[in-house]
UniProtKB/Swiss-Prot annotation:
It comes from the Bacteria. GO terms for biological process: regulation of translation. Belongs to the ribosome modulation factor family. Signal peptide: none annotated. During stationary phase, converts 70S ribosomes to an inactive dimeric form (100S ribosomes). This is Ribosome modulation factor. Coiled coil: none annotated. The gene is rmf. One of its GO terms (cellular component) is cytoplasm. InterPro entries: Ribosome_modulation_factor, RMF_sf. The keyword Protein biosynthesis does not apply. Keywords: Cytoplasm, Translation regulation. It comes from Proteus mirabilis (strain HI4320).
């Protein structure tokens, strides 16, 4: 049975979260499409909130 590919927007969110947890800048977002970019940035923002030791 073939495995379905994950939703592209869910993948963008996940990749953004991973980038945020690694401390990468939001300027390094690889997506140009508005929807994918906004999901990537949403994941990045969530990671910034979840990262320990960062005070704003």
């Amino acid at each position: 049975m073939k495995r379905q590919k994950r939703d592209r927007l869910a993948r963008a969110l996940s990749k953004g979260y991973q980038a945020g947890m690694q401390g990468r800048s939001k300027e390094q977002c690889p997506y140009f499409a508005i929807d994918a970019r906004s999901h990537w940035l949403g994941g990045w923002r969530q990671a910034m909130e979840d990262r320990p030791g960062l005070a704003k």
